[in-house]
């Protein structure tokens, strides 16, 4: 080969070598970036650009696999104390837990086999709904617990009804500040049957299902250890099993709402071959869920807790043990009749318990779907809102199951309940509305619904009427007490809020077996005309304000607006309902 040709070949090879190195560098950078994203943000690859998880295309489960190289221990006093729920506008941030090294004695305990009933009588009592607890000299042993980075879930647009009159949290029902209560940690004393672990069908399933856009739920059958002090739920694997699962769950159905979930205790659900010794055996399933969040507002009491809890726990017919994180005593007292109907056992305060509870069946989190509804195609036993409506009527011993046709009762007048409000979205001409309704044949009842209302009394009032009406707000949640075929009329304030109103109360009412009417007010019926000129964009193009986010919508169209109903315009709605009641 000639020297000239050899030189050209060398230059060509050098160029190709540089290109190859550049290609390798680019590919390497891409792989490093992808690896970082997968490890640090496992959810990021599963959601579309607007941050919402598609209900139809969501994965069946999101598994976070990690190997545990070192045990650590979290002290119980590092968890935030359970407080009454507060609906807030600023994220207060959760305190970080402090990790401590695991002693040799604890390592020995973790690998030991449980001795049935050994520590049952000697276990320390904690605070649970029921009665005064007695303290013993033995403290429950804590599980070795590894701190992992929090799994950040995608932001989901969670619409919340936060009425001014429904945010008086931190109070008992009688308006007194919270007091310190002590409760007996004695879920089902005397249950000494050790859980069985042989369940091949459940062994094949992932422990948790993250596919639901609103709630993450973990369900296990077998040998399960719940250790509140370590905020952990352990599924005991056979020695031959190679499965390793670790999940991080906040058991409150507002998935993606970081403001709300910032106040919820995170629970680690994992498979394990070693665990702390059982100090308490239970023969009934466990359901673990949180209270702090948006509870304290009537709408969120139901859509975030009571409806999901009914969906999750009804199948057990009272034979179920509730373990509540972020306990709010005043709230559990308010809904004590509901808890008593769903469970025969005292509530366990998860954040103030030091025992190791052993179950054969456990559910962490609550089954939840769209706002204030049940998806019967996905719910256990195909439960529906008709079932929930029936459950609430029976729980509060309400007499009317169905609305009776007016023609069957001589001279009977249909009863109309008007939900009044005293702060925002008030009826400015309430007396005129009452007079008009009475003129066309209604017997009118006016009641105010707020956080301090006696739910038992209010439920009886609601159940006694044929029609309930009110401006969009949490008070309309009381429709759960209406008899079948009763009518709910929702007055929608100005501001393009028809779709929100339909989702929050229209769809749920119809799914409960109620008739539903929606009346959207006109510009002349809004008090906003006293604040803005008629040619203002708030009247000519109200939907343009929605781009500023829900907080702006709430402040502008809900908190600063009252309603002066045009009785001539609204009268045909009441007449139409009257005709339906006569059929």
From Swiss-Prot:
Compositionally biased tracts (Polar residues): 149-160
Where in the cell is the protein located? Golgi apparatus membrane
* Source organism: Oryza sativa subsp. japonica
Q: Hey, which stretches end up on the Lumenal side?
A: 43-583
Q: Which residue ranges does the entry give as Cytoplasmic-facing topology?
A: 1-21
**What name does the UniProt record give this protein?**
Alpha-1,3-arabinosyltransferase XAT2
Where does the source fall among the domains of life? Eukaryota
UniProt KW keywords: Cell wall biogenesis/degradation, Glycoprotein, Glycosyltransferase, Golgi apparatus, Membrane, Signal-anchor, Transferase, Transmembrane, Transmembrane helix
* First-level EC class: transferase
Q: Which GO terms describe its molecular function?
A: arabinosyltransferase activity; glycosyltransferase activity
Which gene codes for it?
A: XAT2
Q: What does this protein do?
A: Glycosyltransferase involved in the arabinosylation of xylan, the major hemicellulose (non-cellulosic component) of primary and secondary walls of angiosperms. Possesses alpha-1,3-arabinosyltransferase activity, transferring an arabinofuranose residue to the xylan backbone.
């Amino acid at each position: 080969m000639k020297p000239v040709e050899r030189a050209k070949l060398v230059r060509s090879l050098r160029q190709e070598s540089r290109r190859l190195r550049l290609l390798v560098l680019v590919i390497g950078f891409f792989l490093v970036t992808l690896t970082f994203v997968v490890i640090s943000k496992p959810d990021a690859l599963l959601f579309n650009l607007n941050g919402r998880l598609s209900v139809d295309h969501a994965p069946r489960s999101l598994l976070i696999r990690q190997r545990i190289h070192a045990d650590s221990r979290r002290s119980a006093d590092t968890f935030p104390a359970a407080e009454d729920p507060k609906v807030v506008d600023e994220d207060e941030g959760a305190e970080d837990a402090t990790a401590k090294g695991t002693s040799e004695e604890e390592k020995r305990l973790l690998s030991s086999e449980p001795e049935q009933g050994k520590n049952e009588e000697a276990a320390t009592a904690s605070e649970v709904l029921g009665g005064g607890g007695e303290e013993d000299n033995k403290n429950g042993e804590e599980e070795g617990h590894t701190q992992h980075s929090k799994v950040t879930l995608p932001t989901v647009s969670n619409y919340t009804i936060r009425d001014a009159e429904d945010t008086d949290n931190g109070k008992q029902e009688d308006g007194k500040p919270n007091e310190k209560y002590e409760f007996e940690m004695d879920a089902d004393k005397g249950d000494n049957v050790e859980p069985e672990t042989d369940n091949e069908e459940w062994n094949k399933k992932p422990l948790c299902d993250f596919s639901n856009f609103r709630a993450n739920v973990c369900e296990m059958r077998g040998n399960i250890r719940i250790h509140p002090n370590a905020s952990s739920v352990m599924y005991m694997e056979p020695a031959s099993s190679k499965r390793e699962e670790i999940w991080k769950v906040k058991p409150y159905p507002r998935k993606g709402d970081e403001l709300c979930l910032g106040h919820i205790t995170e629970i680690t659900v994992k498979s394990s071959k070693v665990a702390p010794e059982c100090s308490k055996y239970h023969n009934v399933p466990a359901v673990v869920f949180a209270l702090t969040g948006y509870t304290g507002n009537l709408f969120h009491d139901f859509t975030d807790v009571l409806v999901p809890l009914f969906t999750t726990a009804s199948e057990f017919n009272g034979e179920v043990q509730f373990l509540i994180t972020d306990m709010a005593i005043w709230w559990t007292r308010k809904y004590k009749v509901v808890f008593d109907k769903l469970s025969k056992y005292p509530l366990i305060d998860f954040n103030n318990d030091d025992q190791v509870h052993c179950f054969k069946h456990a559910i962490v989190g609550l089954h939840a779907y769209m706002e204030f509804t049940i998806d019967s195609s996905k719910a256990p036993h195909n439960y529906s809102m008709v079932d929930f409506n029936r459950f609430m009527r029976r729980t509060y011993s309400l007499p009317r199951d169905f609305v009776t046709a007016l023609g069957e009762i001589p001279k009977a007048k249909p009863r109309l309940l008007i939900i009044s409000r005293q702060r925002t979205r008030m009826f400015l001409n309430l007396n005129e509305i009452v007079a008009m309704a009475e003129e066309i044949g209604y017997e009118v009842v006016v009641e105010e619904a707020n956080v301090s209302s006696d739910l038992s009394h209010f439920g009886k009032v609601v159940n006694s009427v044929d029609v309930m009406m009110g401006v969009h707000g949490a008070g309309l949640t009381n429709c759960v007490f209406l008899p079948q075929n009763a009518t709910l009329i929702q007055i929608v304030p100005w501001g393009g809020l028809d779709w929100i109103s339909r989702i929050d109360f229209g769809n749920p009412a119809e799914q409960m077996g109620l008739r539903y009417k929606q009346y959207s007010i006109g510009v002349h019926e809004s008090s906003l005309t006293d604040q803005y000129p008629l040619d203002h964009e708030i009247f000519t193009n109200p939907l343009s304000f929605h781009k500023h986010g829900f907080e702006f919508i709430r402040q502008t169209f809900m908190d600063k607006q009252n309603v002066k109903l045009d009785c001539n315009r609204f009268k045909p709605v009441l007449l139409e309902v009257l005709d339906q009641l006569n059929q």
